C-alpha cells in the first residue's frame, strides 16, 4: 500500500479540502493511522495562537494521528492569493527541503499521509518554480479533484496531461459537485469517466457545510488500497 499521496485540483476552489476530508474519513473507517499534510496554505489568519489556515485546521481535525499545527502546515501565508505572491509579501522563501522533512516525519508516524496541494497543479511558489516540482521530487501518486462546473472537462483533461507529462501517476479522481445548479451533471460525469483512465474514487454531492459530517461513504478506496 502507498504511504502517501497528493491531492491536486483542477483549479482553485474546486473542493480539495472537501475531497480530502471524505478520503480521510474513508481511510479512518478502514482502521488506518492517517496524517494530513498541507505544506503551503495561503489566506491564513492570526487569531492569537499563531498564523493558521482554516483548511489546514480542518484537515488536522479529521486525520486521526495527533499532530501539532506546524507539522500539518509548515508554511501558513497570510494573503489569500497565489503562494508566490503571498510568500514574497512576507519575505518568505519556500524551501522544498522543509516540505520533504515534514513529509518524512509524518510518514514515520502514520500508515498513510494525505498531502493536499494549493490551487491548481501549476501553482507557483516563487517566480521560478511551482509546487508540482516538489511533488515530482517526492514521486507522489496523485488523486485529482474535479469541481463539477462549466469548463471542468477541459480543466480536468489538461491537468491530467500535465501530471502525466511530469512523470507522475494519477491513481484516482474525485468528482465534487461545487454548484447544486450545474446543468447536465450526469453527462459531465459520463464524459469524465470516458476520458480519465484512472478510476473514479467517488462523487461528492453539493454540501454547503462539511463540519461534523462523516463523508467516507462517498469514497471507494479499493483501487487505492491495491497500489
Swiss-Prot record:
> Would you say which domain of life the source belongs to?
Bacteria
Question: Coiled-coil annotation: which residues?
Answer: none
Write down the EC number.
Answer: 6.3.3.3
What reaction does this catalyse?
(7R,8S)-7,8-diammoniononanoate + CO2 + ATP = (4R,5S)-dethiobiotin + ADP + phosphate + 3 H(+)
User: Which positions does UniProt annotate for ATP binding?
Assistant: 13-18, 55, 116-119, 176-177
The answer on whether this UniProt entry bears the keyword Nucleotide-binding reads: yes
Q: Which GO terms describe its molecular function?
A: ATP binding; dethiobiotin synthase activity; magnesium ion binding
The protein's UniProt keywords, in alphabetical order, are: ATP-binding, Biotin biosynthesis, Cytoplasm, Ligase, Magnesium, Metal-binding, Nucleotide-binding
Which InterPro entries does this chain map to? Answer: DTB_synth_BioD, P-loop_NTPase
Q: In which pathway does it act?
A: Cofactor biosynthesis; biotin biosynthesis; biotin from 7,8-diaminononanoate: step 1/2
Q: Which residues bind Mg(2+)?
A: 17, 55, 116
Subunit structure, interactors included = Homodimer.
Question: Which NCBIfam families does this UniProt record tie to the protein?
Answer: bioD
Q: What does this protein do?
A: Catalyzes a mechanistically unusual reaction, the ATP-dependent insertion of CO2 between the N7 and N8 nitrogen atoms of 7,8-diaminopelargonic acid (DAPA, also called 7,8-diammoniononanoate) to form a ureido ring.
Family assignment from sequence similarity:
Belongs to the dethiobiotin synthetase family.
Protein name per its UniProtKB record: ATP-dependent dethiobiotin synthetase BioD
Q: Where does this protein come from, organism-wise?
A: Aliivibrio salmonicida (strain LFI1238)
Q: What is the lineage of its organism?
A: Bacteria, Pseudomonadati, Pseudomonadota, Gammaproteobacteria, Vibrionales
